[in-house]
């Protein structure tokens, strides 16, 4: 029995409440594949679902990679760690490729509003960034370059079409700056991007409407936290490398 759009959306909401994010992602993938432009609510459900699905694998990958490094003297343990890490990597890559296919095939081509276009291009940058975290060699170069390209395109549209206080524009600046810091190892560029976004938003705080006030100020706080952390790390202090992301 094929479910219609409203039933799939309802299923996604139920799955979210039950914290069954794989089910939530499957439901929202089916909604997307129907080929209509998503509403803001549907867009957010899709984003939350995949963010949790991929987030669980990114977190597992970091834990196993760290354990793998600590077992260098024990070949058997290290081999087991390596195999398990590769299993998680394969899952993570499948998820990212799923999202990237939805973006290229449906979401980006169907986006009529600049806000949606920026949202989806940011998402494209994010999922190529997640791929680049686990990639190596030529594959890494390709994913890094694709990520930067998507972020850059989103960034240019956002500067032209959106207020500096818009939560999507701020979220993009946050993640693009994390990309510069973590993936390109360019702390100066990361700090400059984050600081500019923060300062421009502060200067226009009075343009914030009530519904996005909470979202915007939360992201501004994350931008400021990252700036504080990155500045202290570059001055040689041992900082906690837990960058905030949107």
Curated annotation (Swiss-Prot):
Task: Tell me which PROSITE patterns the record gives.
Answer: 1433_1, 1433_2
- The gene designation is YWHAB
Q: What is this protein called?
A: 14-3-3 protein beta/alpha
Alphabetically, the GO molecular function entries are: cadherin binding; enzyme binding; histone deacetylase binding; identical protein binding; phosphoprotein binding; phosphoserine residue binding; protein domain specific binding; protein kinase inhibitor activity
Q: Does the keyword Protein biosynthesis apply?
A: no
The answer on whether this UniProt entry bears the keyword Lipid biosynthesis reads no
Q: Which residues carry this modification: 3'-nitrotyrosine?
A: 84, 106
What Pfam families does the database record attribute to this sequence?
14-3-3
Q: What is the effect of changing residue 99 to I?
A: Found in a renal cell carcinoma sample; somatic mutation
The top of its lineage is: Eukaryota, Metazoa, Chordata, Craniata, Vertebrata
Please give the residue positions where the record annotates the modification N-acetylthreonine. 2
């Amino acid at each position: 029995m094929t479910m219609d759009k409203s039933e799939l959306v309802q299923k996604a909401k139920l799955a979210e409440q039950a914290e069954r994010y794989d089910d939530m992602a499957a439901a929202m993938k089916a909604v997307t594949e129907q080929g209509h432009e998503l509403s803001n609510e549907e867009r957010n459900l899709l984003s939350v679902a995949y963010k949790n699905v991929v987030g669980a694998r990114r977190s597992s990958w970091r834990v196993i990679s760290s354990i793998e490094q600590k077992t260098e003297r024990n070949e058997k343990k290290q081999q087991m760690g390596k195999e398990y890490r590769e299993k998680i990597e394969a899952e993570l890559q499948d998820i990212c490729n799923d999202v990237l296919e939805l973006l290229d095939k449906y979401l980006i081509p169907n986006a009529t509003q600049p806000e949606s276009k920026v949202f989806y291009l940011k998402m494209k940058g994010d999922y190529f960034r997640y791929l680049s975290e686990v990639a190596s060699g030529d594959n890494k170069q390709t994913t890094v370059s694709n990520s930067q390209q998507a972020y850059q395109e989103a960034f240019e549209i956002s500067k032209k079409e959106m207020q500096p206080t818009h939560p999507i524009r701020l979220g993009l600046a946050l993640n693009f700056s994390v990309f510069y810091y973590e993936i390109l190892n360019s702390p100066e560029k990361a700090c400059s991007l984050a600081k500019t976004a923060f300062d421009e938003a502060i200067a226009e705080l009075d343009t914030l409407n009530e519904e996005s006030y909470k979202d915007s100020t939360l992201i501004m706080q994350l931008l400021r936290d990252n700036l504080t952390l990155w500045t202290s790390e570059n001055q040689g202090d041992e900082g906690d490398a837990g960058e905030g992301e949107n």
